[in-house]
Every structure is written in C-alpha cells, then in structure tokens.
Amino acid sequence: MEMFNPPHPGEGVRAYMGDSITVSTLAKHLGMTRANLSMILNGRLGISASVAVKLSEAFPNSDPEFWLGMQVQYDLAQVRKKKRTKISPVLSKAA
C-alpha cells in the first residue's frame, strides 16, 4: 500500500498568504502571536478548531472544515507512519 503523505496545513496557510502578507501581519490579524503562527507555518503546531474558524474568516474562499480536514489528514498520516502494535477487533465476526 502506497503511503499518502499529505502536507501540514501550515503549507496551505503559506499558499493563501502568498508574497503580500507577512507572518507578523497575519498573526496580528488573527489575534495570535507571531511565534504560534510561525510554528503552524513550519509544521510544528497543528491547527485547532478556533484557528480554523479564524483562517476561514481571514481567507473567505476557505472554510473551517477545509483547514481541519487538512489537519486530520496530516495527523492520520503521521500516526500511520509510526511503527505500532496493531489492535485486533474487539468482537469476532460471529457475534
């Protein structure tokens, strides 16, 4: 099975920012610290529901579900990449 490697949503934020919006400007506009926005942009911090709502308001051609969907896809891919003990079904098929 081929591994799906979705981008961190911070890459999507960068794309929406383009070259005309600075990190400081967007952070202030969203009411968050420059450090936290920078961590999102660099893939070190995830997007919460409240940040997703703010992003959808700042970039009206997006919606919160878009941002949270990117985050969920990224998170699931990270978990699937890790070596872990597989969990067996809790019920047998006969039940």
Predicted regions and their residues:
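Short, charged recognition helix plus adjacent turn
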Residues: 65-95
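Helix-turn-helix DNA-binding elements, focusing on the entry/boundary residues of the two helices
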Residues: 23, 34, 48-52
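A short, Lys/Arg-rich alpha-helix, primarily the initiator
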Residues: 1-22, 65, 69
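Short, basic-rich loop-to-helix N-cap that marks the start of a DNA-contacting helix
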Residues: 44-58
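Short alpha-helical "recognition helix" segments of helix-turn-helix
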Residues: 25-28, 37
